[in-house]
């Protein structure tokens, strides 16, 4: 058993009274939670429980779609990212996201990484090469692609493509990394590599992962949040959530009685 406790952690994200609406229908109900800095927090729960919706609030990606609204507070470093004055560009520089299905850009491996950087920073060619290498090393992909950086990224395997997407995200040096079912489309070997990478990423980033795979949550995360029908049922250190949950609903889900 570990000795983790949210009370002893430095807070990265504080959620207060968060509610979310699709077409005026409430899908998140009064969420209060603390995301600790440079830890891995897993969000679990049955399909439709609101876990991916919650993840998308953390970078306001919902704002791209009509009739979606978040109310309440999501404090990143003490500032409310839902406030009208908090710019989307600033938020994107702080919070990066990797999606379920890897989507490499139809360009070279090198350009996949450099493309996003060019929109945020002006770097010399040497600085860009160094940044691309750092990102690929950070995503545990450098050794596999260092001799083919000019080749198309679409020729990579599924697992390599997902690590490329992670590299593309961390190249911008965000503070928070959101992962939405990052291994659901991958084979077991690729999944294992991504899971190992996730545990390494927390040295530099605050990581939040949504997963249907409870074993993955147990293996990778420091803290776990269980959601059901738009509500946060329980949130605590992963060992306790999986071995001694305080709520019956949590125990029923983890033991397979529903979900």
Swiss-Prot record:
Localization terms from the record: Cell inner membrane
UniProt keyword Disulfide bond present: no
PROSITE patterns noted in UniProt: ABC_TRANSPORTER_1, ABC_TRANSPORTER_2, PSTB
InterPro entries found in the cross-reference section: AAA+_ATPase, ABC_transporter-like_ATP-bd, ABC_transporter-like_CS, P-loop_NTPase, PstB-like
GO biological process, one term: phosphate ion transmembrane transport
The family this protein is said to belong to: Belongs to the ABC transporter superfamily. Phosphate importer (TC 3.A.1.7) family.
Function: Part of the ABC transporter complex PstSACB involved in phosphate import. Responsible for energy coupling to the transport system.
Designated name of the protein: Phosphate import ATP-binding protein PstB 1
Taxonomic lineage of the native organism: Bacteria, Pseudomonadati, Pseudomonadota, Gammaproteobacteria, Pseudomonadales
